[in-house]
Amino acid sequence: MSEDKMNGRSIRINRLPATIVAILLTFVLVYFLNFHQEERPAIYGMLRSENPSRVNLRKMLIAAIQAAQRGGLEVLDVARSRQLKERSKGKTDEGVNDPFTDADGRSHCVMKQGLQRIFPRVQIFSEEDKEHCKQAHGYDLDPTVLHETAQIPDVTVNAQDVTVWVDPLDATKEFTEELYEYVTTMVCVAVAGRPIIGVIHSPFNGQTAWAWVGNSMSEYLSNLHPQHSPNNQAPIITVSRSHTAGAKDLARGIFGENVSLLTAAGAGYKVLQVVANNATAYLHTSKIKKWDICAGDAILHALGGTMTTLNDQLINYGPEESPVNTEGLLATLEQHDEYMDKLSKYREAHNGKLA
């Protein structure tokens, strides 16, 4: 207790209630910080100190989903503005214009910078790495993007074993033509060269397909994939719109006269057609960049499917490897060996060529 003199009278101040209030506030703060981390995305990633040489794959999954979705918002914003500022990066091997737009650049900056800020020791490759980002971008981890699934474990790996592949806008040509159904943003996480986390986000329908091999997948992806495939289904091969010329004859030569062809754009979109059983295989006979296919490779693997080169080799996504897969690809959910056997026999009969 203490006494003060005021107007000649003695006033007694009791300090006990203030002490009790301070103690209660301290308990409330400690409880909030320790038991409500999942509800506080802005501080979630900062509350636990981690070994900087290790990477938490659960957090990386969260960040990958957020990156793809945030990149998608940039794509939508540019599309709505109709200020694409399109220019050409040159011609593809098929002689098709390879365009670049503000959507590619803005999505790249948001996606790569956001991921790099959270995981500074991880190597991240983006299709638009040459693009200069005029401002810094970042975001805090938001675990609510996993709300639709059961508990996902905390697994850590060596940061030096992790490689991230980012495609800020897949199917840019179709984006410029307003064929928005083909457009996706993608993130893939590879560990020791193998893809284990894949995210394919479709900005124009707002759906995100993601999977972590051996752990979990998004509800959307699970619902997209039918439980049972039709018995004795005739082959349906999805190929690129730019490869349509001659593709049907090639598909018939490899898989038989009853084959059907599904022409589409965007590697991410074509993988989702295989997942949904709208196609039984995705065939690509020329070179393709790894940021185009890594996320789809991980998703197919999580569902029990397979993606290989046309030489039947798994694709290595390690940091020391070339970013270009020069050996084509075959992606399936089922019957991969059977399809590969037919392809091999066709090549043998045509002096090792697929044309």
Swiss-Prot record:
A GO biological process held by the record: inositol biosynthetic process
Which reactions fall under this protein's catalytic activity? a myo-inositol phosphate + H2O = myo-inositol + phosphate
Its annotated pathway?
Polyol metabolism; myo-inositol biosynthesis; myo-inositol from D-glucose 6-phosphate: step 2/2
Q: Which CDD domains match?
A: IPPase
Uppermost EC category: hydrolase
Q: Which InterPro entries match?
A: CysQ/Inositol_MonoPase, Inositol_monophosphatase-like, Inositol_monophosphatase_CS
Residues spanning the membrane? 16-36
What is the name attached to this protein's record?
Putative inositol monophosphatase 3
Principal subcellular localization = membrane
Q: Which membrane topology describes this protein?
A: Single-pass membrane protein
Supply the alphabetized keyword list: Hydrolase, Magnesium, Membrane, Metal-binding, Transmembrane, Transmembrane helix
Q: Name one Pfam family in it.
A: Inositol_P
What does the entry list as the binding residues for Mg(2+) 2?
D167, D170, D292
Q: Which cofactor does it need?
A: Mg(2+)
Q: Where in the cell is it found?
A: Membrane
